[in-house]
Every structure is written in structure tokens, then in C-alpha cells.
From Swiss-Prot:
An individual GO BP term: translation
PANTHER family: MITOCHONDRIAL 28S RIBOSOMAL PROTEIN S6, SMALL RIBOSOMAL SUBUNIT PROTEIN BS6M
Name assigned to this protein: Small ribosomal subunit protein bS6
Protein's UniProt keywords contain Chloroplast: no
Xref: Pfam families: Ribosomal_S6
Record-linked SUPFAM superfamilies: Ribosomal protein S6 (SSF54995)
Gene designation per UniProt: rpsF
Length: 140
């Protein structure tokens, strides 16, 4: 069994298509991930913006983010499915660093990531040493 990784995909979607049926477009993308063996962690619309240059005669695009987990070998098949999906103008998928998955997902959910236990003390120590360095510089 291959290792399960967490990925982030940023889509540029057809704004007209998304405006007509935002829930349907989101469901379609999430179903593509599920059909290819993935599990959606977080999905949300990011923004709508005029494109820097026309892409397939589209002047404006809706940026949509999806974070999901799946086995690596299935990614090629999923990329093909994304390319064939009607509302998708462009997409970019990246593999997330395992050390950053929790903070990124917490941020995407709108939550505050507190970090692993004991990490707070290290922040206090670094702040104190920074304060000491500033004080020493001011004295010089």
C-alpha cells in the first residue's frame, strides 16, 4: 500500500459556471477526488478576480482551494479528471510538507493552530533572547 499524502489544489474556475451553481461545482470537484481514492479535508472559495491574461477566452476566474489526502499513484489519474472537468480553467496541485499539514488545514478552516504541546515555551524563550539582544544593542 502506498503512502497517503496531503495535497493542496488551487483551481481557476469559470466564474459564470461557479456563480450559477457554487455548491454543484464544489461537489463535482470533491466527487472527482473521492472517485480517485482521495478524502477531502477542507475546500473553500478563495476569491474571484480578473485574470492577468485571457485563458480560453475567459477574462475572469474564481480561485478555489481544496486540501485532500490520497495515495500518490492515484494523483496522475486525478489530474486528468481535473483537466476534463467543465468548470476548471486551470489547476495546480502540490504535495504539502507533512510538518505543515496541521497548521495549513487549521488556517484553511479559519481556526487558530496552537502547535504541539511545549511549543509555547520555546516562543517565550526566543522572545526573551530577542528582547535582550535589542537591549544590548540600545546600550551600545
Amino acid at each position: 500500500m502506498a503512502k497517503v499524502n496531503t495535497y493542496e489544489t488551487l483551481f481557476i474556475l469559470d466564474s459564470n459556471h461557479y456563480a450559477r451553481d457554487p455548491g454543484g461545482v464544489a461537489k463535482q470537484l470533491e466527487e472527482l477526488i473521492a472517485e480517485n481514492g482521495g478524502e477531502v479535508q477542507v475546500s473553500r472559495m478563495w476569491m474571484e478576480q480578473k485574470l492577468a491574461y485571457p485563458i480560453d477566452k475567459h477574462q475572469k476566474g474564481t480561485y478555489y482551494l481544496i486540501y485532500f489526502s490520497m495515495e500518490g499513484p492515484n494523483l496522475t489519474q486525478l489530474a486528468r479528471a481535473f483537466a476534463l472537468a467543465e468548470p476548471v480553467i486551470r489547476e495546480l496541485t502540490i504535495k504539502l510538507d507533512p510538518r505543515l499539514v496541521e497548521p495549513i488545514l487549521a488556517n484553511a478552516r479559519g481556526e487558530h493552530f496552537t502547535g504541539p504541546a511545549g511549543a509555547e515555551g520555546s516562543d517565550d524563550e526566543s522572545t526573551e533572547s530577542t528582547d535582550e539582544a535589542v537591549a544590548e544593542t540600545a546600550d551600545a
